[in-house]
Amino acid sequence: MKILAIGNSFSEDAMRYLHEIAVAGGKDVQTVNLYIGGCSMETHWNNIVNEAPLYMYQKNGQLSDRYVSIQEALDEQEWDIITCQQVSHCSGLMETFNPYCEKIYAFVRERKPNAALWMHKTWAYETDSQHGGFASYDNDQQKMYEALCEAYGAAAASVNVPIIPSGDVVQKVRTVDPFIYQKGGISLCRDGFHIHLLYGRYLVAAVWYETLCGGNILENPFVPQTPELPDAVVDPEALAVIKQCVHEYCSGKCE
């Protein structure tokens, strides 16, 4: 299976461990993230129009020094799945999605008619996030989550694609120990908006694994680690909480 994300740092987070999780689950999954930090759907569309070679080509969760256009990446191989998402601070602002979302998906459908198209539903910011875009939601996590649910639902319906429910599962895990941040638990964000390098990236990759690859994360032995946190030790009980929440949500919602 070959998965391409037309994305930004939030799809970078989602794909960091996806290939490794798939390998551990005995699945042949290749991933590519087209990365521009903070890239909106409007900018993606403008980059398509201009055939701009501005995207870092991140294969199987790894950075590279290769930069490509969306057209070059699409034409490179036969993708099984192609995803796109809105930039996080606009994720709950419905007016920012279209017409760009519709134009992107129409272009990709014409270019790659055999690929299955999906939309990646991203997550709300941490309750104390200092991101400037949080003000659009009155600095309220629940308000941001509800807004992005509405916006992603409408956008996905407008282009007739299913949703990868990362934002839903993140919000679910935030209600379970040890991830209840407002009670002193672990935040699933590393800086108030990007997802935690270990637990958060694992969570979102697990959602993609179950949703797109048909895997069962409960049976998967992969344990995340990163050179960015060389001394970090993953708590197996915390990981088990994530796995259970992901599987419960995805097995019920993603069949």
Task: Place the predicted regions along the sequence by residue.
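A structural signal for well-ordered alpha-helical scaffolds and beta->alpha junctions
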Residues: 11, 15, 101, 145-149, ...
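Intrinsically disordered, low-complexity coil segments
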Residues: 58-63, 131-132, 229-233
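Alpha-helical cap/lid subdomain in secreted, periplasmic
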Residues: 67-197, 210, 219
